[in-house]
């Protein structure tokens, strides 16, 4: 709605409370973590376990053109409250006590020059997910993006890779059934399956949309 769009354009101080900020970010992101794309609990729930992330970190002395572009802010002070610099993340597996990911792993590391803010990236995804469930950067990202994915955000921790691989396997099984029925897939059938995957990826609350979009692109580039 236009009212919601107006809210999204406001900066952090415009919101009356922390719950309102979380809820607006949750809605903007379709209910999934900005980095790993796990489904997030509704922030209205008492035990939501979400974290408000600053893409350009709050506590850093680094500031340059990449930081301004990534955060949408004019300076470090502005970045701490700028709407485009705010993301909502999962708890980074904090409760597990190890193999942290996302904001929990990133901390105050500045990745503005090495990666891209999900809110500032025009294509539908930052990650390409292979059949093995591992995530790599899509074309167009900086050359250091793999380091960010693997070592800073740690998006290839084994638990994330396993669940993405399981998702891929479930769809591959369905594709194989269609192949057996038709003795192979025509280009139209491949395009139809790709369209269904892309539609599913766009549904609010759909986990791991980049995995579905990667599969769709392999079916029908």
Task: Describe the function of each predicted region.
Residues 3-8:
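Short, small-residue-biased leader/transition segments that mark boundaries at the very start
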Residues 26-31, 83-86:
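Short metal-coordination and nucleic-acid-contact micro-motifs, chiefly zinc-binding Cys/His arrays
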Residues 32-38:
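Local cysteine-cluster metal-coordination motifs and their immediate loop/turn environment
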Residues 140-221:
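C-terminal, charged low-complexity interaction regions
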Residues 38-101:
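Histidine-centered nuclease catalytic patch
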Residues 97-160, 164:
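Long, low-complexity, intrinsically disordered segments enriched in glycines and aromatic residues
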Residues 16-24, 73-80:
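Short, intrinsically disordered, charge-biased short linear motifs at domain edges
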């Amino acid at each position: 709605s236009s009212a919601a769009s107006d809210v999204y354009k406001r900066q952090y101080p415009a919101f009356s409370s922390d719950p309102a900020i979380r809820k607006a970010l949750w809605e903007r992101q379709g209910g999934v973590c900005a980095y790993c794309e796990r489904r997030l609990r509704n922030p209205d729930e008492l035990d939501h376990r979400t974290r408000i992330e600053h893409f350009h970190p709050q506590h850093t002395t680094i500031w340059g053109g990449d930081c301004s572009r990534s955060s949408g802010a004019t300076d470090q002070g502005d970045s701490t409250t700028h709407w485009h610099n705010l993301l909502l993340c999962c708890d980074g597996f904090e409760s597990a006590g190890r193999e942290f990911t996302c904001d929990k792993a990133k901390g105050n590391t500045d990745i503005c020059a090495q990666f891209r803010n999900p809110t500032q990236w025009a294509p539908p995804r930052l990650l390409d997910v292979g059949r093995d469930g591992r995530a790599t950067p899509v074309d167009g990202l900086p050359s250091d993006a793999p380091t960010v994915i693997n070592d800073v955000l740690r998006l290839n921790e084994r638990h994330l890779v396993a669940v993405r691989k399981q998702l891929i396997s479930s769809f591959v099984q369905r594709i194989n059934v269609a192949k057996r029925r038709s003795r192979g897939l025509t280009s139209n059938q491949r395009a139809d399956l790709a369209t269904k995957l892309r539609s599913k990826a766009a549904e609010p609350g759909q986990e791991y949309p980049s995995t579905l979009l990667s599969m769709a692109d392999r079916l029908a580039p």
